[in-house]
């Protein structure tokens, strides 16, 4: 029997590797002993014959090696297609149960060895490589399949393969299939795809190694087995179904077994690769690459490049214009608000018209115009105010209303629009604050992010702060919130206060525009604003703020109540009043533009040299009798204020200066120190002429005379407030004839004597005006924000730097556009486009130059000449200059200014380009020639960048025989690197040009005030 068995084995061996391959595949398909053993065991431990191995079978069934060998011989004589299995289920079960016992006793594989995709990790690996199951190369799957109910299988096919494999491969490892070189190559191709998966499978394999033997022991009963009996039904049936599908397909199509096996081996490579593809397909689509340098479009010549350059230059030459979104209230459902709170008291209803007229005459000559004007009140209790407001008034010790308050309070409380004109220090602020509090308390509370109900606009920051301080005593009692917004401090803090909600906003016009334009109008909303006050309205329009004021009014509800107050109201204001007010009531107390009678006015005609000594004399007389008094000195210009400050400090007077050139923090601290008496003397420009209320202020000196009446009235009105007395001294030089008209008129209206010399100066100036030699000045010459931009820019730059250092956001800027800036933008854009030449190949340039030379044109060096501003005439001049230089020097191979681009030096490249920088600003030239920027470009592109030519002033052409204009030569081996370098240099040139244009438009504050 042994001889017969040996012959059968030899016949199988002679069949070649293909037979072995088919046999091994059948072993895996029918459940070999190695497939049934533990993953930690080898297949057979020793090379034994079938007879020696049979007694070790633990079950009671009969094991006949002869029958198995006979069936194996019949199978090898007539081989079948892979998967064509026939037999009986009973015999298959017997053999499959017998094999595990043999293998389990000979387990020699280390337990701690990491298991690959063919081991315990196969369960998770099958999810990624489903085609592995079709090849039946996994031991665990077959062990699962033996527990399922199987169809009828051929006993011949099932039993012959294990013994052929056992006899041939005594040292085969049960965990790894002993295949051919083709299988090893296929496994190697798939190895790198499973490398990352094996790391994750190691932990899973160890857990499975501990769980599966215990589960298998429940099936065998006597000794532990490997296959899991508790596997889910789907996990057991699916490998079987997949295997059967493969078998059926191969059986039907009659595919060669080796081809089918090799095809299945290559399939797993698509399994793992499919997952990354799926991930990429579900990922976010990346932006499409854009070609910056293509063959179809030369650098600097495209229309798109031109548009971009213009846009960039436009941003530098003109700052972005603030646009306030306009609200169409006709399409909104506006909730009506109550504005009329006036109920005429019984005491007033009994008064006749004659008695009312007499009362108004007694109250400083109140003049009113309008229909149905309420009668003036004489007590706080008759004004219709709430009890909390009256309690605060009592705490502030306001005994009775002033003249303007007596008439303005009942008119405003009735919901009418009002124009109030009263002398300085007459209590105009309380005249519009008290009705505003009553107006706000009648409405629903303001929620977060809702706009204010009351809006107060002022022309200066100091006046805004003054009004805000007057509001504070009422805010806590009434439960209201107020925000003071003005330029200088960071806008971020003011926006945060507004978002928390505020019923009252006191703001300057420019900062209010900034807030309304911020974040496309979503920061501040004026939809709930129904009460607007313009304090010192004439000065606001005088400074040119009419467009800004009209923008603000366009965003407020049409049913608003508007109040205008000022100490002066020129006739030119009448037309502007009609634009913003509806049927207003005009109230005039003491006349328009009149200095209070409590103020003593002194006008002195003297030369410039004697002013300072006279000032020292006035200060000495003032502080001789009383130390706790204040004096205010007005000058015309900022530098004059600083100069006078130094002179007074040298004389021992503690003083401070106040003007628009100072930071807002300094301005606030100066006013605070002046009011508290730290510095009893303050030198200021007209910025302090309005809204400044200091009780101890006894002396006002106009060191430089004001040039119009309204300014004089407000300057003098800083003293003699609230019934107190004061003195206003004005110095007028003989050259200031234009100031004589306003000062003389103010003296006449207030009943003060007018000096004869001043009358003569006024007469002389009027004659000059009639003769056309002079122009009368009456105020309203301001240019608005456009004029103030340049004057404030230096201070804003300092503030911006301070905010950046403190982590603050940049302060919002007023954006305006001028025609001059537009012209600069167009010129700079065209210059940048024309300065960059196209990228030219060295060979092409030489060929073109030789062709021109053959035609009798220019020399070969002319082709290498940089373009001079993109003009042919300049190009010819540069070419002729280069030719003359080369002819004179007669030396080759030396790099020098004007040398042709197609040189043979070490830096010569196959491609080159030029960029002329001679006519650009100094900042732009420095940006493209400084060592740091050039080194970065050289490192990034690997090109050669050389600065050539000489600098010539704008408008001057190089003389004959001289070097060409300053330009940059870029050389490189490829067109791409030259284009990249040229693009980077052009970007730097644009940035430098933008910085220069922006610096030019931001001139210092008219040379008035600088910090050194």
UniProtKB/Swiss-Prot annotation:
Alphabetized PROSITE patterns for the sequence: DEAD_ATP_HELICASE (PS00039), HELICASE_ATP_BIND_1 (PS51192), HELICASE_CTER (PS51194), Q_MOTIF (PS51195)
Helicase ATP-binding domain span: 409-587
Motif (DEAD box): 535-538
InterPro entries: DEAD/DEAH_box_helicase_dom (IPR011545), Helicase_ATP-bd (IPR014001), Helicase_C-like (IPR001650), P-loop_NTPase (IPR027417), PRP5/DDX46/KHDC4_KH (IPR056149), RNA-helicase_DEAD-box_CS (IPR000629), RNA_helicase_DEAD_Q_motif (IPR014014)
Region entry Disordered, spans: 1-84, 99-252, 770-829, 851-874
Pfam families for the chain: DEAD, Helicase_C, KH_12
Binding residues annotated for ATP, in chain numbering: 422-429
Protein name stated in the entry: Pre-mRNA-processing ATP-dependent RNA helicase PRP5
Organism this protein belongs to: Pyricularia oryzae (strain 70-15 / ATCC MYA-4617 / FGSC 8958) (Rice blast fungus)
């Amino acid at each position: 029997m042994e001889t017969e068995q040996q012959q059968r084995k030899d016949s199988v061996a002679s069949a070649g590797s293909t037979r072995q391959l088919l046999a091994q595949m059948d072993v895996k398909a029918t459940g070999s002993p190695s497939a049934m053993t533990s993953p930690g065991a080898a297949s057979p431990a020793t090379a034994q014959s079938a007879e020696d191995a049979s007694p070790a079978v633990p079950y009671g069934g009969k094991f006949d090696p002869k029958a198995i060998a006979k069936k194996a011989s019949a199978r090898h004589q007539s081989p079948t297609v892979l998967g064509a299995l026939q037999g009986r289920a009973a015999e298959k079960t017997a053999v499959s149960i017998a094999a595990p016992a043999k293998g389990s006793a000979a387990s020699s594989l280390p337990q701690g060895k990491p298991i690959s995709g063919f081991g315990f990790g196969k369960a998770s690996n099958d999810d990624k490589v489903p085609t592995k199951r079709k090849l039946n190369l996994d031991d665990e799957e077959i062990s699962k399949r033996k527990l399922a109910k199987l169809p009828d299988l051929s006993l011949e096919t099932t039993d012959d393969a294990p013994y052929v494999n056992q006899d041939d491969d005594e040292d085969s490892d049960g965990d790894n299939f002993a295949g051919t070189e083709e299988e090893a190559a296929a496994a190697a191709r798939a190895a790198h795809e499973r490398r990352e998966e094996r790391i994750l499978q190691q932990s899973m394999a160890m857990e499975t190694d501990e769980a599966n033997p215990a589960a298998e022991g429940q099936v065998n009963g006597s000794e532990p087995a490997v296959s899991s009996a508790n596997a889910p039904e789907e996990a057991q049936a699916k490998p079987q179904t997949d295997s059967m599908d493969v078998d059926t397909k191969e059986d039907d199509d009659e595919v060669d077994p080796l081809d089918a096996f090799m095809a299945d081996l290559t399939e797993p490579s698509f399994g793992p690769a499919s997952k990354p593809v799926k991930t990429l397909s579900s990922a976010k689509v990346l932006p499409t690459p854009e070609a910056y340098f293509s063959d179809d479009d030369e650098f600097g010549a495209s229309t798109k490049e031109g548009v971009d350059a213009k846009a960039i230059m436009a941003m530098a030459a003109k700052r972005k214009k603030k646009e306030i979104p306009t609200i169409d209230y006709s399409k909104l459902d506006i909730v009506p608000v109550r504005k009329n709170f006036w109920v005429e008291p019984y005491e007033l209803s009994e008064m006749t018209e004659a008695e009312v007229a007499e009362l108004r005459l007694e109250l400083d000559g109140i003049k009113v115009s309008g229909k149905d004007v309420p009668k003036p009140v004489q007590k706080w209790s008759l004004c219709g105010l709430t009890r909390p407001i009256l309690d605060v008034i009592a705490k502030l010790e306001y005994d009775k209303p002033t003249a303007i308050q007596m008439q303005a309070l009942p008119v405003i409380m009735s919901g009418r629009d009002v124009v109030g004109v009263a002398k300085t220090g007459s209590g105009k602020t309380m005249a519009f604050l008290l009705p505003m509090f009553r107006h706000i308390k009648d409405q629903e509370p303001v929620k977060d992010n809702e706009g204010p109900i009351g809006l107060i606009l002022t022309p200066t920051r100091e006046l805004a702060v003054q009004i805000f301080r007057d509001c504070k005593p009422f805010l806590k009692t009434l439960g209201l919130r107020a925000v003071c917004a003005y330029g200088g401090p960071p806008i971020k803090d003011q926006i945060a206060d507004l978002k928390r909600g505020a019923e009252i906003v006191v703001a300057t016009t420019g900062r209010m525009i900034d807030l309304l334009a911020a974040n496309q109008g979503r920061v501040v909303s004026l939809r709930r604003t129904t009460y607007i006050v313009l304090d010192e309205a004439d000065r606001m329009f005088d400074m040119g703020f009419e467009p800004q004021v009209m923008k603000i009014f366009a965003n407020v509800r049409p049913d608003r109540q508007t109040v205008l107050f000022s100490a002066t109201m020129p006739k030119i204001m009448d037309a502007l009043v009609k634009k913003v007010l509806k049927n207003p009531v005009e109230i005039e107390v003491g006349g328009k533009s009149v200095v209070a009678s409590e103020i003593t006015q002194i006008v002195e005609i003297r030369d410039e040299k004697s002013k300072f000594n006279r000032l020292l004399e006035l200060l000495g007389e003032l502080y001789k009798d009383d130390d706790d008094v204040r004096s205010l000195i007005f000058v015309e210009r900022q530098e004059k204020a600083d100069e006078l400050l130094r002179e007074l400090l040298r004389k021992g007077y503690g003083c401070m200066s106040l003007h628009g050139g100072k930071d807002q923090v300094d301005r606030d601290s100066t006013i605070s120190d002046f009011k508290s008496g730290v510095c009893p003397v303050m030198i200021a420009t007209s910025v302090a002429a309005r809204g400044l209320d200091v009780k101890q202020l006894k002396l006002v000196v106009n060191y430089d005379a004001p040039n119009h009446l309204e300014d004089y009235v407000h300057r003098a009105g800083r003293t003699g407030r609230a019934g107190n007395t004061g003195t206003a001294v004005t110095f007028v030089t003989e050259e200031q004839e234009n100031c004589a008209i306003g000062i003389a008129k103010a003296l006449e209206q207030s009943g003060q004597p007018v000096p004869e010399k001043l009358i003569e100066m006024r007469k002389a100036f009027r004659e000059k005006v009639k003769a056309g030699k002079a122009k009368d000045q009456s105020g309203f010459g301001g240019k608005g924000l456009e004029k103030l931009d340049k004057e404030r820019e230096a201070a804003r730059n300092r503030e911006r730097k301070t905010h950046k250092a403190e982590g603050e956001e940049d302060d919002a800027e007023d954006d305006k556009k001028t025609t001059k800036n537009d012209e600069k933008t167009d010129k700079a854009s065209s210059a940048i486009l024309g300065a960059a030449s196209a990228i030219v190949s060295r060979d092409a340039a030489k060929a073109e130059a030789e062709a021109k030379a053959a035609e009798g044109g220019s020399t070969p060096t002319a082709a290498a000449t940089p373009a001079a501003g993109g003009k042919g005439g300049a190009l010819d001049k540069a070419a002729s200059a280069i030719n003359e230089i080369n002819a004179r020097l007669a030396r080759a191979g030396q790099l020098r200014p004007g040398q042709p681009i197609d040189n043979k030096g070490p830096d010569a490249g196959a491609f080159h380009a030029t960029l002329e920088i001679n006519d650009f600003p100094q900042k732009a030239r420095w940006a493209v020639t400084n060592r740091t920027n050039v080194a970065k470009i050289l490192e990034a592109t690997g090109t050669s960048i050389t600065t050539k030519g000489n600098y010539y002033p704008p408008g001057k052409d190089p003389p004959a025989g001289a070097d060409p204009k300053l330009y940059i030569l870029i050389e490189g081996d490829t067109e791409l690197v030259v284009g990249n370098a040229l693009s980077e240099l052009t970007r730097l040139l644009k940035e430098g040009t933008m910085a220069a244009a922006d610096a030019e438009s931001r001139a210092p504050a008219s040379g008035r005030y600088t910090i050194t």
